[in-house]
Structures are given as C-alpha cells and as structure tokens.
Amino acid sequence: MNSSTALMCFALLLISPLCMGYSDEDREADNLRIAEIIKNAQDDDSKINSTQELLDIYRRLYPSLTPEERESIDKFVNEHTDAIIIDGVPIQGGRKARIVGKIVSPGVKGLATGFFEELGSKLAQLFTG
C-alpha cells in the first residue's frame, strides 16, 4: 500500500505541470502579443481600441504574479479606469470592465492613450524582469 501511494504521488508530480492554466508557452505568446500591440498602436484610436486586449492579457497573467506586482498594476488600473468617461458617463461593471466605447470624447483621448501606454509599459516590464 505504501509503494502504491508513493507511485501515485510521483505520477501526480509528473502530470501537474500539464494541468497548469498559464504555461510558459502562453506567457511567451502574451509577451510577443504585448510587443506587437505596442508596436502597431501608432495613433490614438488604435491605442484606445487595444487597451482592452492589454487588460485581457493582464487578467490571464494575474495568477502568476507576485502580490506586489498585482497590487501595483491593480492600483494603476483602478485609479485610471475610475477617471475614464465615455460619452459623458463613467464606466460601469467593475474595475476591469470594458472601458472603450465606439466614441470617446476628445478631452478623454489623452487620458485613455496615456493609460494604454503606461499599462503596456508595466506589462512589458513584467516579462523583461
């Protein structure tokens, strides 16, 4: 009985890396995608439209971050998403809700593009160390 328990534990150790939700390949793919998003987002509209994808990558990456990294980015996201107003109405649906509408007032474009650039920079730093 003791040897079968040891064998089961050994098998679980071999299988457990295959069951992880965010693999090294996923991490590398997200790293490349962040670089591509930042490189291709040249104008304000493309930056604003790409912000949600950066937030989606952050959500996938979240469980693998240290508490300090999570707190830093969460604080940044919370501060800025509370201030973003689309068509004169504040965002709704939580701190990481979709923040980009079809029409963003010109006064908010600077804030939204600054948010994109800073979030992209913070996420890129997580991958480069």
Swiss-Prot record:
**Per its record, what triggers expression of this gene product?**
By stressful conditions such as bacterial infection, heat shock, mechanical pressure, dehydration, feeding with oxidative agents such as paraquat or exposure to ultraviolet light.
A Pfam family it matches = Turandot
Q: Does the keyword Transcription regulation apply?
A: no
Instruction: Mention any one GO cellular component term assigned to this protein in its UniProt record.
Output: extracellular space
* Chief location bin: secreted
Q: Which UniProt keywords apply?
A: Antibiotic, Antimicrobial, Glycoprotein, Immunity, Innate immunity, Secreted, Signal
Subcellular localization, as worded in the UniProt entry: Secreted
Q: Which residues are glycosylated?
A: N49
What is an annotated GO biological process for this record, any one?
A: response to methylmercury
| Cross-referenced InterPro entries | Turandot (IPR010825)
Q: Does the keyword Secreted apply?
A: yes
Q: Quote the tissue specificity entry.
A: Expressed in the fat body (at protein level).
Q: Where is the signal peptide?
A: 1-21
Question: What is this protein's function?
Answer: A humoral factor that plays a role in stress tolerance; gives increased resistance to the lethal effects of bacterial challenge and stress. Regulated by the JAK/STAT pathway and NF-KB-like Relish pathway in the fat body, upd3 in the hemocytes and Mekk1 in response to septic injury and consequent immune response.
Tell me more from the record. Flies overexpressing TotA show prolonged survival and retain normal activity at otherwise lethal temperatures.
Which family does the entry's similarity section mention?
Belongs to the Turandot family.
This protein is called Protein Turandot A
